[in-house]
From Swiss-Prot:
Its cofactor is Mg(2+); Mn(2+). 1-deoxy-D-xylulose 5-phosphate binds at K125, S151, E152, S186, H209, S222, N227, K228, E231. It comes from Vibrio cholerae serotype O1 (strain ATCC 39315 / El Tor Inaba N16961). Pathway: Isoprenoid biosynthesis; isopentenyl diphosphate biosynthesis via DXP pathway; isopentenyl diphosphate from 1-deoxy-D-xylulose 5-phosphate: step 1/6. Belongs to the DXR family. The lineage of its organism: Bacteria, Pseudomonadati, Pseudomonadota, Gammaproteobacteria, Vibrionales. The keyword Metal-binding applies. GO terms for molecular function: 1-deoxy-D-xylulose-5-phosphate reductoisomerase activity; manganese ion binding; NADPH binding. The gene is dxr. It catalyses: 2-C-methyl-D-erythritol 4-phosphate + NADP(+) = 1-deoxy-D-xylulose 5-phosphate + NADPH + H(+). It is an enzyme of class 1 (oxidoreductase). This is 1-deoxy-D-xylulose 5-phosphate reductoisomerase.
C-alpha cells in the first residue's frame, strides 16, 4: 500500500487525488494533508480521511482547525507553516507525495520530498519552472521518482519508452528515435475572440475554461496561455529537449492531451476525457493502472478533432515563456514570479487582462538586463530572485495605476 502526503489537499488537484484514493482504498492511504487557509474544507477532509497530520499555512488557520478537531475528539496532529509542510513531505512512513500547492509556495515542500527520495507526483509546475537544473540534480542525487501529473506531461510520459520514463531530466530523445514532442493546449476561452475585446475581459470570463475544471489562477493562465508556457518550460526540463524538439499546438477539444512524433514518421498520442483523475491515477499507481472513476472516451460522440498553429499576437505570454525557457534560469524564475503578481492583480480587478503580458514583459526585460545565470546556483539565490522579480512587478503595477 502506498502512503501519501497531499500538498494542496483543498484544491482541485487535491480533490481529484482523493477521488482516486476513494476508488482504490486497498492501494492508497493518507498520512498527511497540507493546505493554505481553507479551514472549513480541511476540517471536512480530516473528518473523512482521519490523517495523522494536518498542516495549514498560518498559525491562525491551524489554531482554528485545532479547535474544531478538539471538539470532535480527533487525534490528527495540527501543524502550520512552511517548515511543517517540508517535514510532512519527508516523513519516513510516507513513500508518495502529491505536490499540488499552487505557485512558488510549493517549491520548498516539493524539494523536501525530492531530497527525501519520495515518489513525487508533480502537479506544481512552478517548482521546475523556478528551479530547473537544481530540481533535476536533486532528483538524481536522492533517487527520488518523478512522475508528471499535468495532463500534458503525463500524456507525453505515457507515449515514451520505459528507458526515458525512468531517466526524466537526463534522457536523450533522439537516441530513442524521437523527433519532437507536441504539447497541445485548448487555447482557452478567448481563442476566437476579437483581439480588440481582450482589453475588457473580466475575471469571471477568464476563469470560465471551456473544457477543464481548475482553480482561478491556473484558469487565468490558461486564458493567457501562460499555463502552456509554464508547461513548455516544465517539459523542457522533464524531457531534456532542445528548442527544435518541443512544439506547441492548439487543440480546442482537449481530447488529445499531447503527442510524441518519432523519426520514422509515427505519432503516438494519449487521449482521454478532460479529467485530472486519469493522469493522477496513472502517476500514483505506475507502472500499474487503477480505476480512476473517469468515464471511457466515447469515440462515437466525438464530432471532430481540430488543430491550429499558435497565434502569438493573441497569446504574448506564451511567446515570453518560450523565449525565457532558453534564456536561462533567471528568466524563467522571474517570469513566473511576475506572472503570479500580475494574475493576482487581475483577479482583484486592479489591472486589465491584457496588462498581464505587459507586466510580465517589463519584469522579464528588467531582470534579464541586471542578472545572469550565475545568480542561480542554489535555492536561496533563486528565492531571492523570485522576491526581487515580485518587487519589480509591484513597482510596475504602481506605475500603471499612477
Amino acid at each position: 500500500m502506498r502512503k501519501l502526503t497531499i500538498l494542496g489537499a483543498t484544491g482541485s488537484i487535491g480533490a481529484s487525488t482523493l477521488k482516486v484514493i476513494a476508488q482504490n482504498p486497498q492501494q492508497f492511504s493518507i498520512v498527511a494533508l497540507v493546505a493554505g487557509v481553507n479551514v472549513a474544507k480541511m476540517y471536512q477532509l480530516c473528518q473523512q480521511w482521519r490523517p495523522k497530520y494536518a498542516v495549514m499555512a498560518t498559525a491562525s488557520a491551524a489554531s482554528e482547525l485545532q479547535g474544531l478537531l478538539k471538539n470532535q475528539a480527533m487525534a490528527t496532529e495540527v501543524l502550520y507553516g512552511e517548515e511543517a509542510m517540508c517535514q510532512v513531505a519527508a516523513l519516513d512512513d510516507v513513500d508518495t507525495v502529491m505536490a499540488a500547492i499552487v505557485g512558488a509556495a510549493g517549491l520548498l515542500p516539493t524539494m523536501a520530498a525530492v531530497k527525501a527520495g519520495k515518489r513525487v507526483l508533480l502537479a506544481n509546475k512552478e517548482a521546475l519552472v523556478m528551479s530547473g537544473q537544481l530540481f533535476i540534480d536533486a532528483v538524481a542525487q536522492s533517487g527520488a521518482e518523478l512522475m508528471p501529473v499535468d495532463s500534458e506531461h503525463n500524456a507525453i510520459f505515457q507515449c515514451l519508452p520505459t528507458e526515458i520514463q525512468t531517466q526524466l531530466g537526463r534522457c536523450d530523445l533522439s537516441q530513442h528515435g524521437i523527433d519532437h514532442i507536441l504539447l497541445t493546449g485548448s487555447g482557452g476561452p478567448f481563442r476566437y475572440s476579437d483581439l480588440a475585446t481582450l482589453d475588457s475581459v473580466t475575471p469571471e470570463q477568464a476563469i470560465a475554461h471551456p473544457n477543464w475544471s481548475m482553480g482561478p489562477k491556473i484558469s487565468v493562465d490558461s486564458a493567457t496561455m501562460m499555463n502552456k508556457g509554464l508547461e513548455y518550460i516544465e517539459a523542457k526540463w522533464l524531457f531534456n529537449t532542445s528548442r527544435e524538439q518541443l512544439k506547441v499546438l492548439i487543440h480546442p477539444q482537449s481530447v488529445i492531451h499531447s503527442m510524441v512524433q518519432y523519426q520514422d514518421g509515427s505519432v503516438i498520442a494519449q487521449l482521454g476525457e478532460p479529467d485530472m483523475a486519469t493522469p493522477i491515477s496513472y502517476a500514483m499507481a505506475y507502472p500499474e493502472r487503477v480505476t480512476a472513476g473517469v468515464p471511457a472516451l466515447d469515440f462515437t460522440r466525438l464530432q471532430q478533432l481540430t488543430f491550429m498553429e499558435v497565434d502569438f499576437a493573441r497569446y504574448p505570454c506564451l511567446q515570453l515563456a518560450m523565449d525565457a525557457c532558453f534564456l536561462g534560469q533567471h528568466a524563467t524564475t522571474s517570469l513566473n514570479a511576475a506572472n503570479e503578481v500580475a494574475v493576482d492583480a487581475f483577479l482583484k480587478r486592479k489591472i486589465r487582462f491584457t496588462d498581464i503580458a505587459l507586466i510580465n514583459d517589463q519584469v522579464l526585460s528588467k531582470v534579464c538586463a541586471t542578472n545572469t545565470q550565475l545568480h542561480c546556483r542554489d535555492l536561496e539565490s533563486l528565492l531571492e530572485l523570485d522576491t526581487m522579480a515580485r518587487h519589480f512587478a509591484h513597482q510596475v503595477l504602481k506605475e500603471r495605476q499612477a
